[in-house]
Design a protein with these regions (language model features):
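Alpha/beta-hydrolase superfamily serine-hydrolase fold, recognizing
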Residues: 2-28, 51, 89-379
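An N-terminal hydrophobic leader/cap segment in hydrolases
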Residues: 33-94
Length: 379
């Protein structure tokens, strides 16, 4: 590992963090990248200092609250100062059954090309390391226009506001409100696809388990670079400067609190906490992942659980890419589009459209599992 970057991990302001030689792989050199994905490869961590501060375990909760509130207000102001091709309506909706007294803000994005009623729905969960939520960073309006669907965007609580399960409760509240108000929103509750990138993908997959527990049955889930586990189990870690193994560790520690890396919490916290049995009856999934994402091996493990549970699952891994480089410029606005990123964007769009067009759910798997259980153990 390059000396300067290795020392950066062990510097004084990262107290109690030790990165031992041979345990971290330095991937900051663009040579690691696919030739069409080397732009936006290494970002000086100093440019990301506000984000890192919000999940730095050495920073007080009071400091995080002050910085996070200021930063979030700027993001929302940025949204409203942007030119829009869709209308955006904001609602405050009741809390979910597990936290009924806590309202959640929900945005409803409506393009001009939707039908008067019974529209498809893109339930889009914005990413941002669970410490920031910037709808401008993702092409939500573009996706709604291209797929002729209504966008539902939960403005969930961030980890410096409330720890797990607050964000999942908010996503649950938004989904329940959407289904309960389907006619008013001119949507079809049986044609809802969840999606999100990074922590948005993590929350989309985790929300899938919450919805399954409550009897909801979304059409599918399409994610990009989702985090699936907070337990570091396999091999050395990667260092890229922004949302690498160090950043992900601190970000998930901030979100999970005392439940961090604990087997006492299930897949509604982190999807790969699921057992194979938990995955039976899970919605169809399309996962897009970078080869050098910090928890790529955990994500592959989660994918194999879906296969063992006979859920519809498709997994795309892109070589020469890490969490935030230009490979995903079309999907989540990182860098400038190139041939490789346009191909990724096309596959992503195809997966969304497949969820809308085809019913890929497998209800018979649940029935066969129940029958087999009954045959083996009786009533």
């Amino acid at each position: 590992m390059a000396t300067n970057n290795f020392e950066a991990l062990n510097r004084e302001d990262k107290k109690n963090l030790i990165a031992e030689a041979g345990r971290v792989t330095d991937i900051t050199d663009p040579k690691w990248g696919h030739p069409d994905g080397r732009d936006f490869w290494y970002i000086d961590p100093a440019l990301n200092i506000d984000t890192a501060t919000l999940y730095n375990p050495e920073v007080s909760d009071e400091e995080k609250m002050a910085l996070g509130t200021k930063r979030q207000a700027a993001y929302m102001e940025q949204w409203w100062n942007t030119e829009h091709s869709c209308t955006c309506e904001k609602y405050m909706v009741p809390g979910c059954p597990e936290e009924p007294d806590t309202e959640c803000e929900v945005w409803v994005i409506k393009p001009k090309n939707i039908k008067p009623r019974k529209n498809r729905v893109l339930f889009y969960i914005v990413g941002g390391a669970l410490v920031s939520l910037n709808p401008n960073a993702y092409p939500i309006e573009k996706l709604c226009e291209e797929h002729k669907c209504v966008g539902i965007v939960p403005i969930y609580r961030l980890s410096w506001q409330a720890k797990y399960p607050a964000a999942i409760n908010d996503c649950h509240a938004a989904y329940k409100w959407m289904v309960d108000n389907a006619d008013m929103l001119a949507i079809h509750p049986n044609k809802v696809v969840l999606s999100g990138s990074s922590s948005g993908g993590h929350l989309a997959l985790a929300t899938g388990f919450r919805l399954k527990r409550y009897g909801y049955d979304p059409r599918g889930i399409v994610t990009v670079s989702a985090q699936t586990d907070d337990r570091e189990k396999d091999g050395p870690s990667n260092y890229s400067g922004v949302w690498d193994s160090v950043e992900q560790h601190d970000g998930l520690l901030q979100y999970m609190g005392r439940n961090f890396a604990s087997n006492k919490v299930g897949p509604e916290a982190m999807p790969n906490h699921a057992t194979v049995e938990d995955c039976i009856g899970y919605p169809p999934v399309f996962m897009h992942q970078s080869e050098l994402d910090p928890d790529i091996l955990n994500n592959i493990e989660f994918y194999t659980k879906l296969l063992k549970a006979h859920s519809f699952a498709e997994y795309h891994v892109y070589g020469g890419a890490h969490h935030n480089n230009g490979l995903f410029s079309v999907v989540k606005g990182v860098g400038e589009p190139n041939e490789y990123s346009m191909l990724v964007g096309k596959i992503f769009d195809t997966n969304l459209e497949d969820c809308f067009r085809y019913d890929l759910r497998r209800p018979w798997v649940v029935e066969e599992y129940k029958a087999a259980f009954k045959e083996k153990f009786g009533e």
